């Protein structure tokens, strides 16, 4: 289990100067050729998402104005707050800030031939399904994960096991993603 606080994470500026990324975790850890990766991006200007051939991207708007995502003849989608949207990352996808204001989103990418992610929003205590990887990010409220207290802009990632996240206040929201490995694949096979 690895814990993080978004306010203390290192920031990587994009080459096109349209935004920045805070990498939460990758699997395998610290590998450039990853099977899955979670990150938080701040988008300050219209631009294109980076291409990642062979990957699926699920993007969830955390804050800021809605964002229009366009990919040639494949889709035109308005990304609304806390509504995950999936697309293959090998296509050119243009992002347009509809309100002209900066937005922040959660991204999870998985290798299409190895694993699949599911992103959800939780508003009550729950236990993960025992997948072989996952990430949680507190949108608001106070949540307990094991012996750790997680509050707004904090979270954790793990590479196996079941975990209970307990809401400690009457209201709260938490984004979570679990990684499921496709038949014939396992994180145990990774060197």
Swiss-Prot record:
Gene3D superfamilies: Jelly Rolls. Pfam families: HutD (PF05962). InterPro entries: RmlC-like_jellyroll, RmlC_Cupin_sf, Uncharacterised_HutD/Ves, Uncharacterised_Ves. Belongs to the Ves family. HAMAP family: Ves. This is Protein Ves. The lineage of its organism: Bacteria, Pseudomonadati, Pseudomonadota, Gammaproteobacteria, Enterobacterales.
